[in-house]
Swiss-Prot record:
Pfam families (UniProt xref): MCCD1
UniProt KW keywords: Coiled coil, Mitochondrion, Transit peptide
GO cellular component, one term: mitochondrion
Protein name: Mitochondrial coiled-coil domain protein 1
Organism: Homo sapiens
The keyword Transit peptide is annotated on this UniProt entry: yes
Comp. bias intervals (Polar residues): 31-52
Transit peptide, UniProt annotation: 1-24
Localization in the cell: Mitochondrion
Length: 119
């Protein structure tokens, strides 16, 4: 059972998922580098003239790979979010069972007191 979260609009849901770039492997570089300033410095220093120019792109393959990686990361985060919701649901069920057990113990204690009260 997944609980509806009406306050979590699509925009906010996606905003929560988009910081997923931190899930990229630490050794990866390039467009998804953890240090965009260093990436820009690499681009300008490789040109030699100090002017900011965009790196040459192939026929969309780099962009396609980037989108595929982003989609993969979003899917991973969605799975984690669903597991979190299921875990929360399980925690609520466990808490409800604990409360039921406590209530039954209290009823048993009262019943035993009423039976043993005359002795």
């Amino acid at each position: 059972m997944v609980l509806p979260l009406p306050w979590l609009s699509r925009y906010h849901f996606l905003r929560l998922l988009l910081p997923s770039w931190s899930l990229a492997p630490q050794g990866s570089h390039g467009c998804c580098s953890q240090n965009p300033k260093a990436s820009m410095e690499e681009q300008t220093s490789s040109r030699g003239n100090g002017k900011m120019t965009s790196p040459p792109r192939g026929p969309g393959t780099h962009r396609t790979a980037e989108l595929a990686r982003a989609e993969e990361l979003l899917e991973q985060q969605l799975e984690l979010y669903q597991a979190l919701l299921e875990g929360q649901e399980g925690a609520w069920e466990a808490q409800a069972l604990v409360l039921k057990i406590q209530k039954l113990k209290e009823q048993m204690r009262r019943h035993q007191e009423s039976l043993g009260g005359g002795a």
